[in-house]
Each structure stands twice: as structure tokens, then as C-alpha cells.
Amino acid sequence: MAVKIKICGITSLADAWAAHDAGADAMGLVFYPGSPRAVTPQQVAQWRGDLPPFMTVVGLFVNATAQWIASTTALCSLDRIQLHGDESPAQCRAWGARAIRAIRVAEAADLHDLARWPVGALLLDAKIKGSYGGTGACFDWQLLGQAELPKPWILAGGLDPDNVEAAVRQVQPYGVDVSSGVESAPGKKDHNKMHRFVAAVRRAQDGAGL
């Protein structure tokens, strides 16, 4: 099965189409005002109908209310919901299989009991104090060799065109997620880097027989 590729932090229709043309499977929209890549539901609603067809649209939320997630999901026709804050398993349960739960990783203990999350997939990101992602930092991928990963899982945190090939070969994830690693500036995607990133993932999976 091909490794799935999600490009997060899309802030414009042009970047959405560039991600599609590069070969990404999914795009992420950040509905978190604290991020330099934040968009509003009203912005997205204006160009949602012009987004590439057959591309999964993921909305990223950080400690948002269930009501706001629901209204944003409806207005923007989101396919998946990524919960990237301090949400509990009970809060995740409301969204079921359409939810992706971000797990911030710094040590082996952060990967214990992942089966408790009632979601469709897990996203493993670097744990940086005071941050909810998008830092460009990696975590120690060797920790994954000791972990039980009961659901489809997505590798995130510090990935870029230069290291993602090695990452995919080493840990063989269901998918990879990139944001700052394919930017020219926060919130502005570098279209050449997106093409290079996707090409590196495909080289890795071809070499590993994935």
C-alpha cells in the first residue's frame, strides 16, 4: 500500500492545488488562531468548492469546543478532523473514525496505551514545550520500534524533502505529515519542496517494497 502523504498548513487555493499536483493525498487546514498557518472557516468556505477533487481535506483543531468543530466541519465540508491539543479520549469519541488524534512524543512513555484513543488514526509528532505542532522538530524515531501501534499511524514532526526518505524506510508508517518542511515562510508553501517531498516518499516506498 502506498504511503499516504498529507501536506498541512495550507492557507490558499493556489497552495492546495500545488499540493495536489505534487501528488499529496490529503491537505490540512489549521483552525487554530495561535498558528502562523491559521485560516478561518469563512476563508475556507469561499474556496472550498474549488479545491481539488478526490483529495482528503483535514481540519486541525486545538482544544476547540465540540460545537465549533461541528459547525466548521459542516461549513467547510471537512473529510477528517485532526485533534491536536489536550483533548481526552472521551472528547475524541464524539468524532469516531473520522478523527485523527495527535500524540506528542518525547520519550517511550508517550507511546504507552495508544489503544485507548477511540479514533481512526494516530499522528505522532514531536513534543515541544508550549507548542501544539508546526515547530519543525523531530522526535527520536527509534522509540517507535518499542511501541505497540494499534491503529493506522502518521509520522510527523520535522519532516522535509531531505529526511523523509530515510524516515519512511526506517519506520514504515501508514502516512507522513509535513508542514514547515515544505515552506518558504510560515504559511507559504514552496511548490518545489512539495514535489521533492512527495518524490522522496515514493522512492522510499519503492526501495522498501511498501
Swiss-Prot record:
List the Gene3D superfamilies hit by this protein, alphabetically: Aldolase class I
In short, the EC number is 5.3.1.24
N-terminal signal peptide? none
Instruction: Answer whether the UniProt record assigns the keyword Metal-binding to this protein.
Output: no
The entry's keywords: Amino-acid biosynthesis, Aromatic amino acid biosynthesis, Isomerase, Tryptophan biosynthesis
Q: Which family does it belong to?
A: Belongs to the TrpF family.
Protein name per the record: N-(5'-phosphoribosyl)anthranilate isomerase
Top-down, what is the taxonomic lineage of the species of origin? Bacteria, Pseudomonadati, Pseudomonadota, Alphaproteobacteria, Magnetococcales
Gene name, per UniProt, is: trpF
